[in-house]
Amino acid sequence: MAAVCLLFSISLTSIQSLTTAKNGGQADTLHYPKSFGFGRTATLKEIALLDTDVRPDGKGLPAGSGKVSEGKLVYAAKCSGCHGATGVEGPNDQLVTIKNPTDPKVKARNKTIGNYWPYATTVFDYIKRAMPFNQPGSLTDQEVYNLTAFLLHENGLIKADDIINAKTLPKVVMPARDFFVPDDRRDGPEIR
């Protein structure tokens, strides 16, 4: 192992010496091209997809509404491949709180929408921005409202016939809401 480290160190020194020699001792001032030939400027439409924010009080939520029954269909089509048929199985993050935590197949308590997230509006915001994984930001507001309703219902937070919209979503009280506190430190090292 020591020989490998020594060889690596000698190689780095040699590369640095060559680079410095070629540039007259100015290795860190190489002139790079203005563009590396990849990427492009984002369009206004692409920027608008990401330029959103939904606050805990619902400010920023779009018009529309969602139903649990419709969300179940959207979930099956666009989410179950990553999160499992019921939101528990995976292979990616678990979304639904386990209804039988004594099941020996269940891992330790995972952070889910039903036991960790502080605000229901965050569910909408996160789905809208980041899902589905293979095409983030592609869901319509209607699909996101439907998915939000379905996931809140599956976590036991709303009834099957509840309608989720900009007025009702902020009123859903999440079980973990009181576990999150605002950071009120002021430019100092103090810790509460």
PLM features per residue range, with description:
Residues F8-A27:
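Bacterial Sec-dependent signal peptides at the C-terminal "C-region" and cleavage site
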Residues E46, K67, Y119, V123, ...:
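Stable alpha-helical elements in mature extracytoplasmic
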Residues G71, Y75-T86, L95, L147-L151:
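The canonical Cys-X-X-Cys-His
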Residues K72, G87-K128, P132, A166:
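Gly/Gly-Pro-rich "capping" loops immediately C-terminal to redox-active cysteine motifs
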Residues C79, F124, K128-M131, Y145-N155:
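Amphipathic alpha-helical interface segments used for dimerization/assembly
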